[in-house]
Amino acid sequence: MSVIKSIKAREILNSRGNPTVEVDLYTEKDGVVSSFRAAVPSGASTGIYEAVELRDGDKSRYLGKGVLKAIKNILEVIQPAVIGKSVSDQAAIDKLMIDLDGTPNKGKLGANAILAVSLAVCRAGAADRNLPLYKYISEIAGTKMRLPVPAFNVINGGSHAGNKLAMQEFMILPVGAKDFNEAYRMGSEVYHNLKNVISGRYGQDAINVGDEGGFAPPIQSNKEGLELLKLAIEKAGYTGLVKIGMDCAASEFKVENGYDLDFKTKNNDGSAVISGEKLGDLYREFIKEYPIISIEDPFDQDDWESYTKLTASVDIQIVGDDLLVTNPERIKTGIEKKACNALLLKVNQIGSVTESIRAALDSKNASWGVMVSHRSGETEDTFIADLVVGLGTGQIKTGAPCRSERLAKYNQLVRINEELGENHNYAGLTFRKF
């Protein structure tokens, strides 16, 4: 049995150039010491109900975004409590850390402190059982493994890019691929066709990329973004095989009297502000005109009524991210209100592996879909690739097929696909059936 011997914690930079937490967890078994590393992501568009990401607030250092407080909590509070504990009991260690924090939102120790240790413990637990991480997660969750449909974010807008596009992500989902490797290739080929379309229409300056590797062209309307995707899919030869998804991140453009589709223009005249009802009509028009199969965060995180109306009126996947923040209580409310039909699973929104698994299983029990997700501020850590296979949720979004912190996850899925061989099961058209 491997037990925790010590923890090292450090401040590293994520893909947005901001500090985040990384830990090395040291274990001992039969006199042999091993180490397991984990790093925590962070978001740009964050829901107000997310667990607390503890930052230092010292403006003279990293503009207040340092994480030395979280690191101190790992070394001085969490480490003494977990030394000698078995890494094979993920739930017990997670509960211990949550109890040490004692707040409903992990505001004392920081979700970034707790999660870093939780992820490392999970890796150590897998090694203790001599199992690949994805297989270990499958066993502790009681789920069936399968390879996910990747949702590649290929056009960036909203808070992820400097253009005027209100909605945050325009994605492609290769649901018609026969396996993950083919889906990966389809995504890459559509991405490069999109690059050619954008550069031909807007010039070379337009193919700069956003935080998640997607292009950020100077387009003015959301419909224009959908047209570009449709054309790129056609040029790649994958019409009917590659579908479209959107993450609207509507909480980012919610204003007092509605939703401002021109929110990135300061002091605008308000002519682009529409009601939740009109915004719902816009989404229904998009669904009729384009091969859209998934829309995430179509409304503000507190606009339950608009969510419920849209979900009842369409047959596509409606995903709750800021609405649910991977929180069991918010998920329960969403199920009761029939506000959406899928969860976006972000481990740092809730702050531990055990709670993330619970959120996925609660969603599964409600016949919801579950899409595992990265954050815009990522690291080279590949945990979520193993998580999505182990849970078998059938769908993952972790950016474009571009930028190393995004490709680290996709490339890990290629390796897992290879390891599983003929035993793998690509979600494909059944991606919503978790």
From Swiss-Prot:
Protein's name in the database: Enolase A
Source organism (scientific name): Dictyostelium discoideum (Social amoeba)
Record-linked SUPFAM superfamilies: Enolase C-terminal domain-like, Enolase N-terminal domain-like
Keywords noted in UniProt: Cytoplasm, Glycolysis, Lyase, Magnesium, Metal-binding
Any GO molecular function: magnesium ion binding
Substrates-to-products reaction catalysed: (2R)-2-phosphoglycerate = phosphoenolpyruvate + H2O
InterPro entries membership: Enolase (IPR000941), Enolase-like_C_sf (IPR036849), Enolase-like_N (IPR029017), Enolase_C (IPR020810), Enolase_CS (IPR020809), Enolase_N (IPR020811)
Pfam family, one: Enolase_C
S-S bonds: none
EC number, UniProt record: 4.2.1.11
GO BP annotations listed: glycolytic process; sexual reproduction
Active site annotation, chain numbering: E212, K346
Principal EC category: lyase
Cofactor: Mg(2+)
NCBIfam families: eno
Biological pathway: Carbohydrate degradation; glycolysis; pyruvate from D-glyceraldehyde 3-phosphate: step 4/5
Cofactor binding annotation: Mg(2+) is required for catalysis and for stabilizing the dimer.
Binding site residues for Mg(2+): D247, E296, D321
Binding positions for substrate per the UniProt entry: H160, E169, E296, D321, S373, H374, R375, S376, K397
Cellular compartments per GO CC: extracellular matrix; phosphopyruvate hydratase complex
Subcellular location: Cytoplasm
CDD domains: enolase
Subunit structure: Homodimer.
Source taxon at top rank: Eukaryota
PANTHER family: ENOLASE
